[in-house]
Regions:
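Helical element adjacent to the flavin cofactor pocket in flavoenzyme catalytic cores
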Residues: 96-154, 190-199
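Conserved N-terminal/central alpha/beta ligand/cofactor-binding core
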Residues: 6-7, 12-118
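Residue-level marker for beta-strand->alpha-helix junctions and adjacent short loops that shape enzyme
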Residues: 6, 25, 126, 145, ...
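Glycine-rich loop(s) and the adjacent beta-strand/alpha-helix scaffold that form part
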Residues: 144-147, 151-220
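Gly/Ser/Thr-rich helix-start
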Residues: 9-13, 17, 138, 162-163, ...
């Protein structure tokens, strides 16, 4: 279910870099690296007060699987240049997709369709359906404004992006003074956060606005 007219989201307007260790690109360049060191270096990106809120177990998991994920992306036709330096990483790990981030959308959309995935655009989820404490589907409004439901055999994945353009959520968790800053993606409304909370989920670290967690258009004032 895609709420916009076409897939893409913030990824579609991003730079498209993918940071990973132990990749084939590093090996070709003669770079000796490890997923363990990658996880250690990642802990130095955020200020200490934010790093204290981080989850080292999740970080190590993602670091450990980053090279395999890059291989998987390339198996679907995506191409990368690099790696290039990205301090405070101690080794060059930034792989940049070519020609740009829209390649992610085009290639993965094609791969999904080949697997029989049906992508409904202008279909906005409005509610998670639950049964005995388990999420079993979603309710959504289609492009005609009609309310429909879809049930799942396995689960529901919330891939809805951040909340940089939801003034209410920002005011609620960050406090006043930030809610009027324009987000770079007008469709980043935190829909997934809202749906999850309505279904009983607990929202964590919603006050963190450092770095890529929330992306804002630069202000003219300094």
């Amino acid at each position: 279910l895609e709420s916009c007219r076409q897939p893409g989201g913030t990824t579609g307007i991003a730079v498209g870099s993918f940071t990973a260790a132990e990749t084939s690109h590093q090996q070709v360049a003669g770079i000796v690296d490890s997923a363990e060191q990658h996880a250690i270096d990642l802990a130095h990106f955020a200020p200490d007060e934010i790093e204290q809120k981080n989850n080292p177990v999740s970080r190590e998991f993602f670091s450990r699987h980053s090279a395999d994920t890059l291989d998987w992306l390339e198996s679907h036709g995506l191409r990368f240049v690099g790696p290039v330096a990205e301090p405070p990483n101690k080794q060059p790990r930034m792989h940049n997709v070519i020609p740009g981030a829209k390649a992610y959308i085009a290639r993965l959309q094609l791969a999904a369709r080949k697997q029989g995935v049906v992508i409904q655009t202008q279909a906005t989820a409005s509610k998670l359906l639950t049964e005995e404490g388990r999420v079993v589907g979603a309710e959504y409004r289609n492009h005609l404004g009609q309310t429909q439901q879809v049930l799942t055999r396995v689960g529901v994945i919330l891939a809805t992006g951040d909340y940089a353009n939801n003034q209410e959520l920002i005011r609620r968790f960050k406090g006043g003074g930030y809610e009027c800053i324009e987000g770079i993606n007008p469709h980043a409304q935190g829909l997934g956060h809202i749906l999850a909370e309505q279904a009983g989920a607990k929202l964590l670290n919603m006050d963190v606005t450092y770095g890529p967690e929330l992306r804002f258009v630069a202000t003219a004032k300094r």
